[in-house]
């Protein structure tokens, strides 16, 4: 195993040389794929088919009476889910142009999920409704650009209306209600999230893990969240969550950039000696040093991850020393005459688990001395009191919260791996929705906030008739969430929509779980404004783009034909890639 690490420098150079040879060889014999081009009505109609098929699969999950979707997987048992974005991500069509339309809807779902953490099904349903009407209008001779202007005008009006009606939430009961709704009516999950937020604060770090029992549990551990993610996606260990998860890792903290490949080899050898994963936090990891880490991760299956240090200047240095205190590490700093050439195991930090995403890193249960952590917290508190700068105070308070606040871990239990996976999807949605509700407030749920906002569009003035049609497209689309929720509950959606629009109480809605018309706020059926707003804005944006599309270019699939120049010798005499066969990975 040591030979793998120590030889990696020369292997990296060989790999780059071979890549260059391959590139020059391929450039001289490149094959260009033929393209299929479709125009106008035909192009939009084919994309619409993809949008409709994907939306039909996603919309059945909407609401408390939404149905399950079973997804075949290339490995393991089929996945059972009620999560809209999971369903959307799993769908690919054989027809290339259908797939273009579906891919753009998936972008809407992903964008909504990234910003608000929930509302993907609502965004998909709205996209389908807007694009369908947009296609019909353009086919009837309407000006596509005026339709787009009308759609934007209507969306801006609706967003303003929703913001004026939003109510901020503060109590634990209100937080539990939001979590319950987003978890498809699971009260236990809603209360668990409310308790976690109460424990670590609304800005605190809450993570979700597989439990080891049949029941859901809340555990609060000492931990820290770093606002930086992995330097390279090659460090990912869990493709499903797109995260790097390291159990019981060694933690190296370096104040400067790391570019010395020999120093990196020594660090890897120490981690291998202890048979433990490795987390590196430094200003940056560059060129050959980064290539060394990636090659060992991919070829030798060594669990390793590199993260850029958070902050800038003195603030970065302070953050690194905070992390060192939490994990019991020693910051490698040139000010003390330290470097990686004389590193030993006593300089590494330790913790129970590290989870790294593309945006942040969570360090759980650091092995630092409790007294040292307490003293550092007191030191930061003194600095807060002495500081006269609001900016400095804010940064110091952030550091204090990270050191002293802890991390809430939601351990999700179940009778089987399939059940735990499905519950984790719902808990993730509920947690994201709850954070969104705390951030921007809540509106009546069940789609009624959008439904009643459609009334505001009746009196909206436009520059011309085509823009008016654009406004009407949004007006009709805003009715689809209530319609879909009611239909999934087994009742006539059009009847429910009509009955709600006839009356004037803006909080009255249809409780699909009980089959009753109720005051949605009093019944605890609420939606985060951020989720609804993001879903509508993203849906309108992509639908407008699709409606104004006049041509679609896709590749015509061709059968693979072996090049006569390549022969059977592994790319024309490359000799097993110049010795790479002996890499031993």
Swiss-Prot record:
Domain of life of the source: Eukaryota
Boundaries of the annotated transit peptide in chain numbering: 1-32
Species whose genome carries this gene: Arabidopsis thaliana (Mouse-ear cress)
HAMAP family from the UniProt entry: CH60
GO-annotated molecular function: ATP binding; ATP-dependent protein folding chaperone; copper ion binding; RNA binding
Any GO CC annotation of this UniProt entry: chloroplast stroma
Family membership: Belongs to the chaperonin (HSP60) family.
Protein name according to UniProt: Chaperonin CPN60-like 1, mitochondrial
Keywords for this protein: ATP-binding, Chaperone, Mitochondrion, Nucleotide-binding, Stress response, Transit peptide
Compartments in which it is found: Mitochondrion
Listed GO biological process terms: protein refolding
Primary site of residence: mitochondrion
Functional summary from the UniProt entry: Implicated in mitochondrial protein import and macromolecular assembly. May facilitate the correct folding of imported proteins. May also prevent misfolding and promote the refolding and proper assembly of unfolded polypeptides generated under stress conditions in the mitochondrial matrix.
